Amino acid sequence: MRAIISVLLISAMVFSIIEAVPLEEGLQLFEAERVGCLPRNRFCNALSGPRCCSGLRCKELSIWASKCL
């Protein structure tokens, strides 16, 4: 019984998080990231993918993370 209640609560939380950003707004944000440059403190890829805006460089912070700084 506890497992069923836990699954229902987790499902409700996931659904509320997904619905927090409307689909159209999410698509606009995604398109802006794909086409434009990345602002400060956004994750980047030094070898491929979106580039940092002018004046910023893609700095490797760890093996798994690089940010525009």
Curated annotation (Swiss-Prot):
UniProt-recorded Gene Ontology molecular function terms: toxin activity
A single Gene Ontology CC term: extracellular region
Tissue specificity remark: Expressed by the venom gland.
Signal peptide: 1-20
Intrachain S-S bonds: C37-C53, C44-C58, C52-C68
Coiled coil start-end: none
Propiece span(s): 21-34
This protein's record includes keyword Secreted: yes
Localisation: Secreted
Domain of life: Eukaryota
Pfam entry (one): Toxin_7
Keywords carried by this UniProt record: Disulfide bond, Knottin, Neurotoxin, Secreted, Signal, Toxin
Membership in a protein family: Belongs to the neurotoxin 01 (U2-agtx) family.
Summary of the function given for this chain in its UniProt record: Insect active toxin causing rapid but reversible paralysis in crickets. No activity shown in mammals. Does not show effect on mammalian voltage-gated calcium channels.
Record's comment describing the protein's domains: The presence of a 'disulfide through disulfide knot' structurally defines this protein as a knottin.
Protein name: U2-agatoxin-Ao1e
Organism (species): Agelena orientalis (Funnel-web spider)
